[in-house]
Amino acid sequence: MSNKASHHLFDLIKSLSKSEKRYFKLYSSRHTIGEENGYLRLFDFIDRMDTYQEDLIYMHFKDQPLLNKFSITKARLYNNILKSLNAYYASSSIDAQLFQSLHCADILFNKGLYKQCEKVLRSAEKQAKKNERYVILMEIKQQQRKLVENEFYTDF
């Protein structure tokens, strides 16, 4: 992560609300085995800064594995924060719920669970119609068509 990108990480952390920060910490701690997560320590340290100063980070985490590939660590922290925000806001918008349903349907289709896929798509279709989300409805119809084509080819 370049210095400019480092400021993006700092800006992202500073933009988080108190509840978003708490959610990130809970989200991140689920993926930790054993001792404290280095990402959380870095997150907390950056959060306490008034301005981004990478030299202070290097001094604070001196001789710790966290700094071995620091640009990768910062990039992963940035991406983990975005993933946690995605999970945090997943149920807050109808569009997010519909895209989640489409994603689940795609997974079920790829696993060969066609009846379950069809059920998820039917539910998403009702929700999209009810909320007048016609662009997403077209994607749902596309996946339903894929199901019908698959059923046609597997019947022979």
Where are each of the predicted segments found?
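Extended alpha-helical scaffold regions
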Residues: 1-156
